[in-house]
Regions:
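Sec-dependent N-terminal signal peptides
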Residues: 3-13
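N-terminal alpha-helical interaction modules that lie
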Residues: 18-99, 150, 160
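Canonical positions in the second alpha-helix
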Residues: 108-109, 143
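Boundary/linker segments of alpha-helical solenoid repeat arrays
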Residues: 117-118, 145-159
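The tetratricopeptide repeat
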Residues: 118-119, 126
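TPR/TPR-like (Sel1-like) alpha-helical repeat modules
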Residues: 128-151
């Protein structure tokens, strides 16, 4: 009885998982006629398009693995630099100069890792601290959309 109750409680969570289907992602992101054609999705993402849907983010995030720019085994020295700069920022009272330096370093790191929640969070913070609410919101939305895409694929322990 107890196992049945636990199963019934987790059933809605399992039903909502959006498992990435490799063949579909490849087909959709490589087809220039598809609404999920990768170059177009990436342009929308980079421009801060706030009309991107969960489905757009699904194909954007998982389609990145099939792009020439995807090099998961390469070290991202720009990420290391951005983290080092972030460690020098006084988050209670940041200077304009330190925030501009952080933004530049994070943008460099995002070239190699465009969906890093850590980098997007730093960027949202820096823009917010500078009073640039537009870019703060763009990067906050990007971060949350990427995290939601990852979460939608399952619980991290198994698919679905």
């Amino acid at each position: 009885m107890r196992k049945l109750l636990v199963l019934l409680l987790f059933l809605p969570l399992m039903a909502t998982a959006k498992i990435p289907v490799e063949e579909d992602i490849i087909r959709q992101t490589l087809d220039s006629e598809s609404p999920y054609y990768y170059p177009n999705l990436m342009l929308r993402y980079q421009s801060g398009d706030d009309s991107m849907t969960e489905e757009d983010y699904h194909y954007l995030y998982y389609g990145y693995a099939y792009q020439d720019a995807y090099k998961p085994l390469n070290a991202n020295s720009d990420m290391d630099k951005a983290i080092l700069i972030a460690q020098t920022v006084d988050f209670e009272n940041p200077t304009h100069e330190s925030l501009e330096k952080l933004i530049a370093a994070v943008n460099d790191a995002l070239v190699q890792d465009p969906f890093s929640p850590k980098l997007l969070n730093l960027l949202a913070f820096a823009y917010g601290a500078l009073g640039d609410s537009k870019n703060e919101q763009i990067n906050y939305n990007r971060m949350n959309s990427i995290l939601a895409t990852i979460e939608d694929s399952g619980n991290g322990l198994k698919e679905g």
